[in-house]
C-alpha cells in the first residue's frame, strides 16, 4: 500500500503593525524564553493566528476598523497559514468581523493586538518547556 503525501500549500499574508506592537511581540518572545529557540516575531504572529482560528473570540468593542490617522503602521511581518487555515480565517472574517474590520489583514492585526493586551498564552509553548 502506497502512502501519498498531501501537498500542503502555505499562504503568506502581509500585515502592517505599529512599531510599538512589534516591540511588544519581541518582548513577549523574550518573556516566554522563545528567543533561545530563535523564534521571530513573524513566527509568533503565525502561532497567535493559528491558535485564534481554533477559538475565534475577540472583544468587538476594542476592534480597529482600519488605518487610524496619525498612526502609521511602519513595521511589517508575514503570517504563514496553510490553505485550509486561510480559508477558515476568511470564513470567520466574513461571518463575524466584516463590519468591524476593513480586511482580513486588519483582522489579523486586531488578533495580535488583543492577544498582547490580554497577555495570552500560546498552546505551542508547552512543547518548548
Q: Whereabouts are the PLM-identified features?
A:
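Short intrinsically disordered coil segments
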Residues: 30-32, 94-96, 125, 129
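Short, basic amphipathic alpha-helical segments that act as recognition/interaction helices
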Residues: 36-63, 100-129
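Intrinsically disordered, low-complexity N-terminal regions enriched in serine/proline/glycine
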Residues: 27, 36, 89-92, 96, ...
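Active-site oxyanion-binding pockets that recognize sulfate/phosphate
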Residues: 8, 35, 98
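Short Lys/Arg-rich basic patches
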Residues: 1-22, 29-30, 58-94
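Extended, hydrophobic interaction surfaces within ordered domains
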Residues: 11-53
Amino acid at each position: 500500500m502506497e502512502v501519498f503525501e498531501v501537498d500542503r500549500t502555505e499562504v503568506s499574508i502581509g500585515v502592517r503593525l505599529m512599531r510599538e506592537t512589534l516591540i511588544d511581540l519581541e518582548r513577549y518572545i523574550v518573556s516566554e524564553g522563545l528567543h533561545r529557540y530563535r523564534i521571530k516575531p513573524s513566527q509568533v504572529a503565525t502561532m497567535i493566528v493559528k491558535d485564534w482560528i481554533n477559538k475565534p473570540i475577540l472583544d468587538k468593542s476594542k476592534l480597529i476598523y482600519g488605518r487610524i490617522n496619525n498612526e502609521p503602521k511602519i513595521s511589517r511581518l508575514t503570517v504563514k497559514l496553510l490553505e485550509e487555515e486561510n480559508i477558515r480565517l476568511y470564513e470567520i472574517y466574513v461571518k463575524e468581523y466584516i463590519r468591524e474590520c476593513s480586511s482580513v489583514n486588519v483582522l489579523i492585526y486586531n488578533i495580535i493586538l488583543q492577544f498582547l493586551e490580554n497577555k495570552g498564552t500560546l498552546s505551542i509553548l508547552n512543547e518548548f518547556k
